[in-house]
Every structure is written in structure tokens, then in C-alpha cells.
Swiss-Prot record:
Keywords: ATP-binding, Ligase, Nucleotide-binding, Protein biosynthesis. Allows the formation of correctly charged Asn-tRNA(Asn) or Gln-tRNA(Gln) through the transamidation of misacylated Asp-tRNA(Asn) or Glu-tRNA(Gln) in organisms which lack either or both of asparaginyl-tRNA or glutaminyl-tRNA synthetases. The reaction takes place in the presence of glutamine and ATP through an activated phospho-Asp-tRNA(Asn) or phospho-Glu-tRNA(Gln). One of its GO terms (molecular function) is asparaginyl-tRNA synthase (glutamine-hydrolyzing) activity. This is Aspartyl/glutamyl-tRNA(Asn/Gln) amidotransferase subunit C. It comes from Prochlorococcus marinus (strain SARG / CCMP1375 / SS120). It catalyses: L-glutamyl-tRNA(Gln) + L-glutamine + ATP + H2O = L-glutaminyl-tRNA(Gln) + L-glutamate + ADP + phosphate + H(+); L-aspartyl-tRNA(Asn) + L-glutamine + ATP + H2O = L-asparaginyl-tRNA(Asn) + L-glutamate + ADP + phosphate + 2 H(+). Signal peptide: none annotated.
């Protein structure tokens, strides 16, 4: 396995625009190396007979019929506003002229 050097960590952190202190560079190098070793183990698994999936549990849309219903709640909701002008809420002006 290729050894992750301190220079590699510095380069990646610079590309990612992350500030890493010198005391943490070696720690991150070791962690990245462990991650790459784990990925190498995963690459050895035979997945030829396993179909590709996007998720572990299949998701199904639950649909219902649309029911047209007369509803006149607009006026009731507008009546709850502290200030109303016709079919609109009236709010204080926030932009200066």
C-alpha cells in the first residue's frame, strides 16, 4: 500500500482550503492511510452477482386520489392578520425610499 506522506496531507488540506496544524499532519496521514487500506479490502469483495442498488430498502410512493373540495378558508385566515387590505396582508414597510 502506498504510504500517505505528510506532504500529501498538506497538499490535500491546501486544495480543500483547510488549515491543519503541523501537530495534526501525521495523525491525519495515518488516518487517511487506514481509510485507503479499508477501501482496498472492499475492492477485493466479489460483487459480480450482486445487482447495483441506490438504497438498502426499496422506497415506494404512496399515492391517493385527488379529491376536489370546496374550501373557503382564505377569508378566515386573512381575518387572523392584524392588518389586512382586501385579499392581502398589510405589513409595515421595510425598504427605505
Amino acid at each position: 500500500m502506498t504510504r500517505i506522506s505528510s506532504d500529501d496531507v498538506r497538499k490535500v488540506s491546501k486544495l480543500a482550503r483547510l488549515e491543519i496544524s503541523e501537530e495534526h499532519v501525521e495523525t491525519y496521514a495515518n488516518q487517511l492511510e487506514e481509510i485507503l487500506e479499508y477501501i482496498a479490502q472492499l475492492e477485493k469483495i466479489d460483487t459480480k452477482n450482486i445487482p447495483p442498488t441506490t438504497r438498502a430498502v426499496e422506497v415506494v410512493n404512496v399515492l391517493r386520489e385527488d379529491i376536489v373540495d370546496k374550501s373557503n378558508v382564505r377569508d378566515k385566515i386573512l381575518d387572523l392578520a392584524p392588518n389586512r387590505e382586501g385579499q392581502f396582508y398589510r405589513v409595515p414597510k421595510i425598504l427605505a425610499e
